[in-house]
Amino acid sequence: METVVSGIRSTGKLHLGNFYGAVKNFVQMQNEYNCYFFIADYHSLTTHPTPEDLHGNVRQVLVEYLAAGIDPEKATIYVQSDVPEIAELYLYLNMNAYLGELERSTSFKDKVRAHPDNVNAGLLTYPVLMAADILIHKATKVPVGKDQEQHLEMSRTFGNRFNRLYKTEYFPEPFAFNFTEKLVKVPGLDGKGKMGKSEGEGNAVYLSDEPEVIRKKVMRAVSDGGPTEENQQKPEAIQNLFDLMKIVSSADTYDHFDSLYNQCAIRYGDFKKQLAEDMILSTAPIREKINEIARDETYLREVARFGAIKARESASKTIREVRQIIGFKSF
């Protein structure tokens, strides 16, 4: 059975983009693959969270993983920092990662532009840590979005470089994988691209948002004065809202409002109300489970403990073998 590895940074609550773009696929994958789904708390340290926020965010993602349908009996769910072997492999891979290639990372350059006062080594070596996350379980399939494909390519580079250096074929090549044929891209509500935790207030709809919060966010979403010509191209902000409707609403509902737009007869108030209600309906089962699971501290501790044991079984085997390949031996 092939191994799948993926994770989500513990930087806050999960939103519709996380669910439809990743976690929904995780739930399907767990039935057919050997899956490791982790909470990436090491990665979140680049933004310097407080200890309280770090722990709270890890707990929140764990709750929401479970509420969304990831089953700890089928998949290994674990917290990244509970598997110290990842940090050790990260160290070894760093010894063969070079400044030039790390500085060419598109993600690194974007972060430098956005936060020039926080250009830390963790940001620079982010792709190396991602490679360690993947290679520690010798994964061959990695569900990633378009923005992570370069990092996955670098993971292959680091694994192949290790193999060449030590004249082995130890690490397999990991490749991008999505359970469905088409990668779902979930736009935000601010009219400027994808939904994300760091994209500003009002951009994201969270799985835990109460109905009234969702209604307010959607009604405030960026729109315009409406179409002035029949069948005109939708501007980005409006196209984003229609893309959201395509994800959460029925095909008939989408076609109805698309037809109204093309006839210059759409009322954005009615359109947004429908979109909000469909978002509320689509997230209701998860929201109810979040509230239920969040109260069960014993269950959460047990899931995290069980996941750490399973993940370390795989990771410790890899590290033992990597040490031998490198030449670390006890006297």
Residue spans of the language-model regions?
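N-terminal Rossmann-like or analogous alpha/beta NTP/dinucleotide-binding catalytic cores
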Residues: E2-A132, N291
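Short, solvent-exposed beta-strand edge segments and adjacent coil->beta transition regions
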Residues: T11, A139, G200-G202
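Conserved nucleotide- and phosphate/pyrophosphate-binding catalytic cores
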Residues: N18, Q150, R156-F331
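A generic secondary-structure signal for well-formed alpha-helical elements
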Residues: L62, G69, A97-G100, A139, ...
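Short helix-capping/linker segments at secondary-structure and domain boundaries
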Residues: L99-E103, I136-P143, S249-F257, R287
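Internal, conserved structured core segments that host functional sites
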Residues: D110-F162, Y166, P187
